[in-house]
A protein has these predicted regions:
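Core alpha-helical transmembrane segments of integral membrane proteins
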Residues: 215-244
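Soluble extramembrane regions of membrane proteins in the secretory/endomembrane system
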Residues: 1-213
Length: 244
């Protein structure tokens, strides 16, 4: 899932790519979604990067759901492998909220007097954000709205047909072949990618990122919380047994 470890990892990868003067950075993505704050941090990093970022949803069977859809839209080049999907970009609270179009949800009718003001604000904000990314990158604005409002999803082939992504590639060498000669817009300039004969260097997560990923894993966090709660109960029940 997208979270603080993802931000740390991508920031380090972008700095490394800039230091090496790499012609591009391929961000391989497979995510069910994640935290809104972390997603926005990542998008800011991508949009201000001096190195072109090509997000590649891969391998086959991977997905760029929810927050992953926003990251894909924000990338200089959006690409997917066959058999992958994206979408379902409706924001939900950590506790869970009914998605638009489901029974009991008033997200479809934002003027409903019984609707949640906070829910309307969250959905409107998310829609405007994804719409702005679509306009910036010249991608399908109408579908971006539907992905937020109605949690719509697309396969890789459908996304290519609807101008949601730029490329469908079977693997990284195929992706590089299709990228060669492609013109992209960076912050202050336009750049033509020259990807023929490039050597691929994989950037692995460092120990700091791996530790953060372990600690912030929901299952691990829940276990640590239980250990803390039971530790407090035991200490209150038998004070001084473990700690004088």
């Amino acid at each position: 899932p997208i979270g603080p470890p993802s931000v740390s990892y991508i920031e380090r990868a972008l700095k490394d790519a800039a230091r090496r003067q790499s012609p591009l950075l391929i961000l391989q993505l497979d995510t069910p979604g994640g935290l809104d704050a972390s997603m926005r941090e990542i998008i800011q990093l991508l949009m201000t990067s001096p190195v072109p970022v090509v997000t590649f949803v891969a391998p086959s069977g991977a997905r760029a759901a929810s927050a992953g859809t926003y990251i894909l839209y924000a990338s200089h080049v959006a690409s997917m492998a066959p058999g992958t999907n994206l979408g379902a970009a409706t924001p939900v609270k950590l506790g869970g909220v009914a998605a638009p179009g489901t029974p009991g949800s008033d997200a479809d009718n934002l003027s409903s007097p019984g609707g949640s003001d906070m829910q309307r604000k969250i959905i409107n904000d998310a829609e405007a954000y994804l719409r702005s990314l679509a306009q910036l990158r010249g991608r399908n604005v109408e579908w971006a709205v539907q992905a937020v409002r109605n949690a719509e999803s697309l396969s890789a082939e459908e996304a290519l047909q609807k101008n949601v992504i730029d490329i469908v590639a079977a693997h990284v060498p195929d992706l590089l072949a299709q990228l060669d000669g492609k013109e992209i817009k960076l912050i202050h300039q336009t750049q033509v990618l020259r990807t023929s004969g490039l050597t691929i260097k994989k950037i692995e997560p460092d120990w700091h990122t791996q530790l953060l990923s372990f600690i912030t894993n929901p299952n691990v966090a829940y276990i640590l919380m239980l250990i803390g709660i039971y530790g407090l109960i035991f200490e209150f029940a038998t004070p001084g047994t473990l700690i004088p």
